[in-house]
Amino acid sequence: MDWIQTAGAGTQLPENNIKIAVFGIGGAGNNIIDDMLRMHPELQTANVQFFALNTDLQHLKTKRYVQNKAVIQFEESKGLGVGGDPQKGAVLAHHFLEQFHKLSDSFDFCILVAGFGKGTGTGATPVFSKFLSNKGVLNLSIVSYPAMCEGLKAREKAAKGLERLNQATDSFMLFRNDRCTDGIYQLANVAIVKTIKNIIELINLPLQQNIDFEDIRSFFKKPAQRLENEANLFRVTNTFTFSFDAHNTIEHFSHKLKNFEYEGFFDHKVEGAQKVILKVLVNQGLYPLDLTQIQEIIWAKIDNHNLEVQLGVDFTDANPSVQLFFLMEKKQAVSSDFIQKPAFISVKEVNQKPAKPFQVLNDLKELGLKYVKQQTGFNY
């Protein structure tokens, strides 16, 4: 065990050695992990490691920033991929389990990132997740669901993959590719990278009113015993962030949270959520926050009197902010609404006759470009 000296006290305390692994599985997962290390190389430390796993050696070689790479292969497969077949992806993953055990053995928390709808991510992710769960390792999966333009076959593969994943993982987040416009999947990478970064910092950066690792485990962990009517429910999580300043007030926070389902990329409404992690960073000199008012806005949105809350509070020199993680149990892996109108479109527009497909795409394109401008500062 490692120890640190406490100044002036003459005592020693053990260091926080919680180890986190982030595995990008398949092409989409590899892309996200590589983007993450390009944008945030400081996140990789002795206790936080990133891995790219793929059946396609050619694609794996194109990743420049992730150093830990492994080919999911077995004899005759030769790193040539699986041709979009999830069954082949699962078979190769089973053959790879001994190596996966060596890669994942020392970690306390594993995040699996993949695109669903093709072969490697859809087939291998549930296999790796089940392996981790059987070992008692906390694991969260962050996966994407194909847009309609990617074809119904891809959606069928993804839906079956989600059913297998739900039986294996502790919980999962679902990103909807149909929320991207004109196939701008870089938006997906930005959103998922931010989410992973927030989770890592939630675990590794202590707060004045702290959220410890056991709090996080109890939030994400699937109960050992579930009632019969709960066994097939999908345990999905979602995340929300908001930073306050002179132009982003408590009223804007309330509006954004109320319209959360229309403005984000992750699937599922949060009404009726069972659990919430609420992390608040306070700077009262820059922008005073009323924590009670913030909580009341959240309670009104979720509308569940049995809500379990883990609250963490700390001080910051930057703009104050709120981070929320929700956990819900749903009957469906993917919410039934396909594409909804953005919240800022007027009621008059909504009441008009249904939009033609190209009109919907143009609306979504406008929404996506506004998001890119907001996130990057670039003007299109």
Curated annotation (Swiss-Prot):
It is found in: Cytoplasm. GO terms for cellular component: cell division site; cytoplasm. GO terms for molecular function: GTP binding; GTPase activity. CDD domains: FtsZ_type1. It comes from the Bacteria. Gene3D superfamilies: Tubulin/FtsZ, GTPase domain. GO terms for biological process: division septum assembly; FtsZ-dependent cytokinesis; protein polymerization. GTP binds at G27, A28, G29, N30, N31, G119, T120, G121, E150, N189. The keyword Nucleotide-binding applies. Its main location: cytoplasm. SMART domains: Tubulin (SM00864). InterPro entries: Cell_div_FtsZ (IPR000158), Cell_div_FtsZ_CS (IPR020805), FtsZ/CetZ (IPR045061), Tubulin/FtsZ_GTPase_sf (IPR036525), Tubulin_FtsZ_GTPase (IPR003008). Keywords: Cell cycle, Cell division, Cytoplasm, GTP-binding, Nucleotide-binding, Septation. Disulfide bonds: none annotated. Pfam families: Tubulin. Homodimer. Polymerizes to form a dynamic ring structure in a strictly GTP-dependent manner. Interacts directly with several other division proteins. HAMAP family: FtsZ. Essential cell division protein that forms a contractile ring structure (Z ring) at the future cell division site. The regulation of the ring assembly controls the timing and the location of cell division. One of the functions of the FtsZ ring is to recruit other cell division proteins to the septum to produce a new cell wall between the dividing cells. Binds GTP and shows GTPase activity. Belongs to the FtsZ family. This is Cell division protein FtsZ. It comes from Mycoplasma pneumoniae (strain ATCC 29342 / M129 / Subtype 1).
